[in-house]
Swiss-Prot record:
InterPro entries: PCD_sf, Pterin_deHydtase. GO terms for biological process: tetrahydrobiopterin biosynthetic process. This is Putative pterin-4-alpha-carbinolamine dehydratase. It is an enzyme of class 4 (lyase). It catalyses: (4aS,6R)-4a-hydroxy-L-erythro-5,6,7,8-tetrahydrobiopterin = (6R)-L-erythro-6,7-dihydrobiopterin + H2O. CDD domains: PCD_DCoH_subfamily_a. Belongs to the pterin-4-alpha-carbinolamine dehydratase family. It comes from Rickettsia felis (strain ATCC VR-1525 / URRWXCal2). Its EC number is 4.2.1.96. Keywords: Lyase.
Amino acid sequence: MTVLSEKKCIPCEGGIPPLEKKEIDKLLVQLQSKWQVNELGHLYKKYKFPNFVKAMEFANKITEIAEQEAHHPDLTISWGACSVEIWTHKIDGLTESDFILAAKIESINS
């Protein structure tokens, strides 16, 4: 099995169904972290930091990955925290690329 963080995000042009719950659950296990699927059906994780500057530095690292992968999460930055929400906008659901991006984000601090 290929590690998610070693894969590339594939741009979605729509016309495909979102992942089913069974597939989502398998991919969540592969992330091996505290990512969740929120009430909107998006991948979500809140990272905590000792201050605003560290949260912003983390967000900037995510920006670099997002640009490389051409897949962009929603980020909410506050004092001591950066929340990340990922989904494939074209289908308003989750694809494997969402999990690939989450894995790459997860590797920032490892």
